[in-house]
Amino acid sequence: MLIIIHRVNSIEKLKEVPKEYGVEIDVRAEGKTLILNHDPFLGGEALEEYLKHFNHKFIIFHLKETGIEDSIIDLAKKFKIADYFFLDMENPLVYKATRERGFKKIAVRYSEAEPIEFALAHKGLVEWVYIDTQTILPLDKYLYKRLKGAGFKLCLVCPNLFGRRDDINKYREFMQENNIYMDAIMTELEDAREWKRD
């Protein structure tokens, strides 16, 4: 299972992340430069400079605005980064990218507020489903089998990103008991070991 560390938006933070982990970054434009920041109007480090230091397993490009996708793809190619997906690409762009260009490095969301039917409608079109855990784990054995049977890779959001560290062990135990296996977990660096232990 791949561990992906949440919101690693600086080179300094990137250097703290073990190489065997992935990272999630927030990408937006500032003029003609792609920068990293979760919030608007605050500036941030240039994505291109950041990628010079990236030597990790995976990257989630969390899109904070539209129209920057092709520039990110170009930078990923420049730095020979093949293992990544886009998160929060707008639906019209997902439609165009998947159906007109055959681009699959995209995650669609599934959660208690986002129906599984939306994810399943992208069977064969995108590689990943991003499973949010705002208040619950929205999976049981049946729903898990539907998603895996459709060929998706699954990335689960750690409940502690919503302030529920106590749920980590509950989720781990539930998944083990029900033979539910995630391809990736997005979590904070301090919680990574909780997901890796047997």
Model regions: which residues?
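Phosphate-group recognition and catalysis centered on beta-loop-alpha active-site segments
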Residues: M1-D198
